[in-house]
C-alpha cells in the first residue's frame, strides 16, 4: 500500500484533476485505489446531503467505491476558505478528528491512496492548525500540483520549501497548464514555456510525474481519464 498527500500551489492549481488522473492510471493497471477529500467547501445541497464535485470525482476513481461520508467527512456549502466555512457551519474539524477518521480507510491498505488537501499547503484547518498537519501527522510523502501560469516558479518553490520544512518528502510534482496565455503559438513563447519547465525540474529536486495540457474533455470522469494519459505513477518516474 502507498499513500500520498496531494497539495497544490494554489486553490485552482488542478489537485483534483491530477489526483483523479493518477487514480485512473492506477486502475488501468488493475490496482485498488482510494481518493480522500477530508475537508471541502463549495458543496452543493442534494437529497443525500452536501456533496462536493471534487470529492465525487475522487469517489468515481476509487475502486472499490467507498461511501461518500468515508472520503469527505467535513463538507461545507459556502465556497470560501474551509476554516471560515467550518466556522459558519459551527462544525470545526481538528487534526485529531481527521486522523481518527482516515484511520479506517487507510487500514484497507489499497494499492494507491491519495488524500487531497484544500487550496495550498498553508491553508488553515481551524484557528490553530493547518490542513497540512494531517500529512505531517501521518508522515505522508507529498505530491505537488503546480498550476502552470505566470508566477508559478515562485509559488512552486515556496510550496516545496514549506513541505520539506515540515519534515516531509516531496515524492513528485505535476505541472497543470491552467493559463491559456501560456500557449506556444510563437517560437519564443514555446521557448519560455520550456525554460519554465526546466527551471521547475531543476529547482524542485523531485521527479516530474507529468505535464497535463489544457483538456477538452467535458465531464470530470472523462477529464480524469484524459489526464491519466499524461501522468506517471509515483515510483515509476
Curated annotation (Swiss-Prot):
Which compartment or compartments is the protein found in?
Cytoplasm
Q: List positions binding Mg(2+).
A: 16, 54, 116
Q: What is its main location?
A: cytoplasm
| Residues of the active site | 37
What UniProt keywords apply to this chain's record, in alphabetical order?
Answer: ATP-binding, Biotin biosynthesis, Cytoplasm, Ligase, Magnesium, Metal-binding, Nucleotide-binding
- Presence of the UniProt keyword NAD in the record: no
**Pfam family of the protein (one):** AAA_26
Q: Which residues bind ATP?
A: 12-17, 54, 116-119, 213-215
An individual GO BP term: biotin biosynthetic process
Q: In which pathway does it act?
A: Cofactor biosynthesis; biotin biosynthesis; biotin from 7,8-diaminononanoate: step 1/2
GO molecular-function annotation terms? Answer: ATP binding; dethiobiotin synthase activity; magnesium ion binding
Disulfide linkages recorded for this protein, renumbered to the chain, are none
Q: Which domain of life is it from?
A: Bacteria
HAMAP family in the record, alphabetically? BioD
Q: How does it assemble?
A: Homodimer.
Name of the protein this chain belongs to: ATP-dependent dethiobiotin synthetase BioD
The gene is: bioD
